[in-house]
A protein has these predicted regions:
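Surface-exposed amphipathic alpha-helices with a cationic face
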Residues: 35-36, 75-79, 103-108, 176, ...
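Conserved anion-binding
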Residues: 1-90
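C-terminal helical cap(s) of enzyme catalytic domains, especially alpha/beta-barrels
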Residues: 128-134, 149-186
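Electropositive phosphate-/nucleotide-binding environments in soluble metabolic enzymes
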Residues: 25, 64, 68, 98, ...
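Short, solvent-exposed amphipathic alpha-helical segments in soluble enzyme
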Residues: 33-36, 59-62, 105-110, 129-133, ...
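A C-terminal functional module that forms or caps the active site or interfaces directly
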Residues: 91, 95-142, 146-153
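A general structural detector for well-ordered alpha-helical segments in enzyme core domains, enriched
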Residues: 31, 70, 100, 104, ...
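A polyampholytic, Gly/Pro-enriched intrinsically disordered region
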Residues: 3-7, 133-140, 161
Length: 186
């Protein structure tokens, strides 16, 4: 909320925002306060999909990678703001690191995991299985470029730019089939 004089405004009414944990608790706590008050959520950057993420996120602290320590903090923060089955505190964990995703899912069983890196960055349905709980829930898979610009991919080029919507629909249908198939075959 933004206070202007005696009036309070809601400039954006998003349900979740992404938060960088490297400011520490005093940088995250204001967001947790909003989670509690408004039943909104945050996704905390834990293990991102970009190739250089390991420069910091994989650093060892007392024999453990930093991303695991951040994952534990996400789980602790999440206990403060539980929804029906999942916490309002989720995590960003890249599809390009499925083994780390498996470890982090165990650390954060009640957190939604936002999974970038599917499609354009190389993540495939089989890579995503560790991010989901055993019931097939708990992960939100993102594929921005793979969907928005599907018509630029060889597979969907026949649609052309003028039919980008149809190309995007086909890409989404293929993505659903890929992920669903991988989850069924786990």
């Amino acid at each position: 909320r933004v206070q202007v004089g005696s009036k309070s405004y809601v400039p954006f009414d998003e349900d979740f925002v992404t938060v960088n944990p490297y400011l520490g608790s005093d940088g995250v706590n204001p967001f947790l306060d909003v989670c509690k008050k408004e039943k909104k959520g945050i996704f905390v950057l834990v293990k991102t999909s970009n190739p250089s993420s390991g420069e910091f996120q994989d650093r060892q602290i007392d024999g453990r990678p930093l991303y695991e320590l951040v994952g534990e903090k996400v789980a602790a923060w999440g206990e403060e703001v539980m929804g029906d089955a999942y916490s309002y505190v989720g995590a960003v964990v890249g599809a390009t690191y499925p083994e780390m995703g498996r470890t982090l899912r165990k650390i954060m069983p009640k957190a939604y995991i936002l999974v970038p890196g599917y499609g354009a960055q190389g993540g495939k349905g089989a890579d995503l299985v560790p991010f989901f709980n055993e019931d097939g829930l708990g992960a939100i898979v993102n594929s921005s470029r793979g969907i928005i610009a599907a018509y630029k991919q060889e597979k969907y080029a026949g649609f052309g730019a003028e039919n980008f919507g149809e190309a995007s629909r086909a890409a989404v249908e293929d993505m659903i089939a890929d992920i669903s198939g991988a989850l069924k075959n786990r």
